[in-house]
Amino acid sequence: MPRSVRNLLLLALPALLGACATGRGPTEVATKDTSKSFNTVVVDAGHGGKDNGAYRRFGGAEKIATLDVAGRVSHKLRESGLKVVMTRSSDVFISLDERVEIENAQTNSVFVSIHFNDSRQRGIHGFETYYHSPNSAELASRIQGKLMTITNSTNRGVHVANFRVLRKAKYPAVLVECGFLSNRMEGGEARDSEYRNQLADRIAEAVVEQRYGSSRRTAKAERKLNQDDTPFLNTD
């Protein structure tokens, strides 16, 4: 082997080993850009079953809040004329690989994963949205922007992340962190039905606008996006 080639391989080896160790290698799936043409939305309620997610006395179990918000988002999106597939519609455990299978089984779709945040520092609060593929960035930014219209919201930004459900998605995919359960104010709000409906309104509105544009939203969607405050899950 020529010395120059050997030297290049030696230089590249640490980076390759690091990528293998962390799982943060290149995108594993070539993502198709359906960010403006999708007719299906896969709505993912984070955690579930034996996996509580974050569990704080202010906000309760994350798996309960995510399921409620995801149910509301799904209802509003269906009213807009979009097809919706939920990764779970009850308190059951769904592995990350199963979630990936569900999202990738759809065609001409986008994926929206609902989560709540957690921190050891109770003062930390705010919304943040994550994406992995470049063609997911616009939807992530749109959702984050809509969440910022909620009173007293704090913008923690839009970030690239290597989460499995984003990294392995065949279509545009985002993950939304709807505030910190560890924060007294946001954790308390996460238990409130009206506040969860606000979260669902903003997320659904962003998805509808991403697909149809703000000027093309149907009258039916306009009426329904801010309607029906009935809880989707009994959290008592």
How would you describe each model-predicted region?
Residues M1-D236:
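Catalytic-site microenvironment of enzymes
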